[in-house]
Curated annotation (Swiss-Prot):
<feature type="region of interest" description="Disordered">
    <location>
        <begin position="21"/>
        <end position="41"/>
    </location>
</feature>
<dbReference type="GO" id="GO:0003723">
    <property type="term" value="F:RNA binding"/>
</dbReference>
<feature type="region of interest" description="Disordered">
    <location>
        <begin position="83"/>
        <end position="107"/>
    </location>
</feature>
<keyword id="KW-0813">Transport</keyword>
<keyword id="KW-1048">Host nucleus</keyword>
<dbReference type="GO" id="GO:0003700">
    <property type="term" value="F:DNA-binding transcription factor activity"/>
</dbReference>
<dbReference type="InterPro" id="IPR000625">
    <property type="entry name" value="REV_protein"/>
</dbReference>
<dbReference type="GO" id="GO:0051028">
    <property type="term" value="P:mRNA transport"/>
</dbReference>
<keyword id="KW-0694">RNA-binding</keyword>
<dbReference type="GO" id="GO:0044196">
    <property type="term" value="C:host cell nucleolus"/>
</dbReference>
<feature type="compositionally biased region" description="Polar residues">
    <location>
        <begin position="21"/>
        <end position="34"/>
    </location>
</feature>
<keyword id="KW-1035">Host cytoplasm</keyword>
<comment type="subunit">
    <text>Homomultimer; when bound to the RRE. Multimeric assembly is essential for activity.</text>
</comment>
<dbReference type="GO" id="GO:0030430">
    <property type="term" value="C:host cell cytoplasm"/>
</dbReference>
<feature type="short sequence motif" description="Nuclear localization signal and RNA-binding (RRE)">
    <location>
        <begin position="32"/>
        <end position="48"/>
    </location>
</feature>
<dbReference type="Pfam" id="PF00424">
    <property type="entry name" value="REV"/>
</dbReference>
<protein>
    <recommendedName>
        <fullName>Protein Rev</fullName>
    </recommendedName>
</protein>
Amino acid sequence: MRSHTGEEELRRRLRLIHLLHQTNPYPTGSGSANQRRQKRRRWRQRWQQLLALADRIYSFPDPPTDTPLDLAIQQLQNLAIESIPDPPTNIPEALCDPTENSRSPQA
């Protein structure tokens, strides 16, 4: 009976990992080249976080039966994906102004 519960626990963890992977689909091809590049970069960052989280879920030990449920819940709440901030939408004027090029020699 113990091996049956172990198999069920493994199936539950694998379903959870599968659900995590489904929540991060590969980005679509719309937008400019730079926008597509940024989308892929952010997707790759989220993917790395999901892989790390899935590894932690898979290797997370079962709580012992004598451990209080609150402690087990607290340990599970520590498993979280960090939010990745979006890049700024507008570029500062100092970077956009071609007349102020610091590399050009002053005549």
